[in-house]
Amino acid sequence: VPNLRFPKFQGEWKKTKFGDIATGFDYGMNAAAKNYDGVNKYIRITDIDEASSTYTDKDIVSPDGILTDNYLVNNRDILLARTGASTGKSYLYKQSDGKLYYAGFLIRANVTTHDPYFVFSQLHTHRYWRWVSIMSARSGQPGINSQEYSSFPIYTTSIEEESKIAKLLSLLDERIATQ
């Protein structure tokens, strides 16, 4: 339980596994990128901004492959980088980013019963990055697979408290982005 809380909220927070509050943990499509077709965007690790964890549309491309809904990014989806120096980088889907298909070096988790921004915010903590460092240090090439990501400890509380915290954090993130 954090030391500072909004008034009226009390009680212990619950420690659970990411895989207990999210579904999927699916790998993205194995396709090359091609020129943007005007509709279908392809998000790769390099399209996730390092500082803001948002989709960067500086170099929009489309996937060069068979487009199925299996690889579409949807509301409540979090994408996680699974290999290389960017292991641990994450992105929370926003409808304003448009129709996105995700690439094979990303893993998609859909947060089902909790506030996705609240969960996403926990993927930007010192605790998370320490976990990423430990989990990905086992071999010469850093990486975390879907089963390992699903084991990451997540803290949860009531949906009302999560939503209030998420709203505050998103307002702060928006404010920082406009500076």
Language-model features: locations:
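Hydrophobic structural patches
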Residues: 1-7, 165-176
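Non-catalytic DNA-recognition/assembly elements of restriction-modification systems
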Residues: 4-27, 151
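Short, well-ordered beta-strand elements within core beta-sheets of diverse protein domains
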Residues: 7, 64, 107-111, 151-156
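Sequence-specific dsDNA recognition surfaces
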Residues: 19-32, 46-77, 93
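Cleft-lining beta-strand/loop regions that shape enzyme active-site pockets
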Residues: 43
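Short, ligand-facing micro-motifs at secondary-structure edges
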Residues: 48-60, 78-103, 116-121, 130-134
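A short glycine-rich beta-alpha junction/loop motif
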Residues: 99-105, 137-160
